[in-house]
Design a protein with these regions (language model features):
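Tandem CBS (Cystathionine beta-synthase) repeat/Bateman regulatory domains
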Residues: 1-134
Length: 134
């Protein structure tokens, strides 16, 4: 059995997080995603008692394209995932991967001191979490 120190999520998370309002239409959100090169957007909380949401390409594919809805007529809040599971930046990468598997998710905001400091995904876990790839 090989024991390896995979390191913390902090080492592979993306720190340039783009947040949008849930009232934004999906077409505008997709334009933002394309412009910043993001595969997900964090949907802002409406107040301190609210939770974060996330918009993924899979939400758009399943809830807009597959249902033949016009993206300019659908609001982000209608199709986003909410509430979302969050992870800590000091969480071990292998536990983050297990969390994703156990809950069927592929992205999660990274939260420290009640603020989003990054985003982590399977893509980032694999390509930036494996030390032998550097």
């Amino acid at each position: 059995m090989t024991i390896r120190n995979w390191g913390p999520v902090r080492d592979c998370m993306r720190t340039d997080v783009t947040e949008v309002d849930g009232q934004l239409d999906v077409l505008s959100a997709l334009k933002i995603m394309k412009k910043v090169g993001a595969t997900s957007l964090v949907v802002k909380r409406r107040d301190d008692n609210d939770e974060y949401g996330m918009l993924l390409f899979s939400n758009v594919a399943k809830k807009v394209i597959a249902k033949n809805r016009a993206p300019e007529r659908v609001n982000v809040y209608e199709i986003m995932a909410k509430p979302v599971l969050t992870v800590r930046p000091d969480m071990d990468i292998r536990y983050c991967a297990r969390l994703f598997e156990n809950f069927g998710i592929s992205h999660a905001p990274v939260v420290e001191n009640d603020k989003i400091v990054g985003i982590v995904s399977y893509y980032l876990l694999v390509l930036h979490g494996l030390p032998d790839l550097d």
